[in-house]
Regions:
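Metal-dependent enolase-superfamily TIM-barrel catalytic cores that perform enediolate-based chemistry
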Residues: 129-161
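Structured loop/turn residues at beta-strand edges in well-structured enzyme cores
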Residues: 1, 101, 158
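Metal- or metallocofactor-binding catalytic centers and their adjacent structured scaffolds
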Residues: 5, 38-114
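Conserved structural scaffold segments of CAZyme catalytic domains across common CAZy folds
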Residues: 98, 105, 117-119, 128, ...
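N-terminal small/glycine-rich loop or linker at the start of catalytic domains
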Residues: 41, 115-141
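Solvent-exposed alpha-helices and their adjacent loops that cap or buttress functional pockets
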Residues: 26-29, 123-126, 156-157
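Structured beta-strand/loop patches that form or line metal/cofactor-binding pockets in enzymes
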Residues: 1-46
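Glycine-rich, charged/polar anion/phosphate-binding loops
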Residues: 20-23, 119, 150
């Protein structure tokens, strides 16, 4: 089996009522996407992905070039091909590694379909407990230090460490 194509479809939900940002990027719109990995045997792996212009360029550019023609079941090998020699540095960083994550998830979906196995089984089984984390602390217009402290204290009060 060989990878023949990688596609990325996206959808935009428009502008956010309340944009937010972290130390790196400001988020003003909402949307999402799906990466699809197609093979010569008709098996297609899919996974959710953002569909920003940067992510689109990474997935349909450098990553696609490295994976088309390869065996999709060799996920470790393909991960190394994607990781080494990202777009501008010796190793992957930032949006590039986020793009890799979507492709990696689609490869696992493809492998599960090809082998007739659920991905959880391919990944080694199940666990009775999973450590969760709270993502927050984003900046917003009108949100100051007191509001940030209140938000983060709420996560701690809910049991997040």
């Amino acid at each position: 089996m060989k990878i023949t194509d990688i596609k990325l479809t996206g959808v935009s939900f428009g502008a956010l009522d309340k944009p937010f940002w972290n130390s790196i990027v400001r988020t003003t719109t909402s949307g999402g996407g799906r990466v699809e990995i197609h093979t010569d045997e008709g098996v297609v792996g899919m996974a959710p992905s953002g569909a920003s212009a940067v992510r689109r360029a990474h997935i349909l550019g450098a990553i696609k070039t490295k994976l088309v023609g390869e065996d999709p079941l060799r996920i470790g090998h393909l991960w190394e091909r994607m990781y080494m020699g990202g777009t501008r540095k010796p190793v992957a960083k930032g949006e590039y590694i986020t793009s890799m994550s979507a492709v990696d998830n689609a490869l696992w979906d493809l492998k599960g379909k090809a082998l007739g196995q659920p991905v959880w089984k391919l990944a080694g089984g199940v666990r009775n407990r999973v450590t969760a984390y709270a993502a927050g602390g984003y900046y917003e217009e009108g949100k100051g230090i007191p509001e940030m402290c209140e938000e983060l204290s709420g996560y701690a009060a809910s049991g997040f460490r």
